[in-house]
């Protein structure tokens, strides 16, 4: 009795060919620039805020709204930077950005950063473009 099993390499190649195009060619390309934080008087400025939002593939207003709620302050988006009322350490800002990435960027099913936020009726979902999973998220 002879069974014709697929060779592992052939199965792996077949699986690779069926991956979406945006997933195939990335290695560990998800790199978020560190926040360039400066404190001027009673204001904290994140100089590269727009660059961070672009790296996360998120609307800067959404990221700003999250950040303002997390640190309980007021702030404005001015061009490529954000001005926050109050003095906040770079460590605090970095931790809040990590929390945002965990909750609103990284797919909880497969761990891919290739996600987008979609709205269906009154609910918001994190839709993964790599595995197709849709995970409900808290609306800001």
From Swiss-Prot:
Keyword annotations of the record: Initiation factor, Protein biosynthesis
Cross-referenced SUPFAM superfamilies: Translation initiation factor 2 beta, aIF2beta, N-terminal domain, Zinc-binding domain of translation initiation factor 2 beta
GO molecular-function term, one example from the UniProt record: translation initiation factor activity
One Pfam family of this chain: eIF-5_eIF-2B
Record-linked InterPro entries: IF2/IF5, TIF2_bsu_arc, Transl_init_fac_IF2/IF5_dom, Transl_init_fac_IF2/IF5_N, Transl_init_fac_IF2/IF5_Zn-bd
Protein family (similarity comment): Belongs to the eIF-2-beta/eIF-5 family.
Alphabetized HAMAP family for the sequence: eIF_2_beta
Function of the molecule: eIF-2 functions in the early steps of protein synthesis by forming a ternary complex with GTP and initiator tRNA.
Subunit details: Heterotrimer composed of an alpha, a beta and a gamma chain.
Name listed for the protein in its UniProt record: Translation initiation factor 2 subunit beta
Organism: Pyrococcus furiosus (strain ATCC 43587 / DSM 3638 / JCM 8422 / Vc1)
């Amino acid at each position: 009795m002879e069974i014709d099993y697929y060779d592992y390499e052939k199965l792996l190649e077949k699986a690779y060919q069926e991956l979406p195009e945006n997933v195939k060619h990335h290695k560990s390309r998800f790199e978020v620039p560190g926040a360039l934080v400066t404190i001027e008087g009673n204001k904290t400025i994140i100089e590269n805020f727009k660059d961070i939002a672009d790296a996360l593939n998120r609307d800067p207003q959404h990221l700003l709204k999250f950040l303002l709620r997390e640190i309980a302050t007021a702030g404005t988006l001015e061009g490529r930077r954000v001005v926050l009322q109050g003095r906040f350490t770079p460590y605090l800002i970095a931790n809040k950005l990590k929390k945002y990435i965990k909750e609103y960027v990284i797919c909880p099913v497969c761990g891919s950063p290739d996600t987008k936020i979609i709205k269906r009726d009154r609910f918001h979902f994190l839709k993964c473009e790599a595995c197709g999973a849709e995970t409900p998220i808290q609306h800001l």
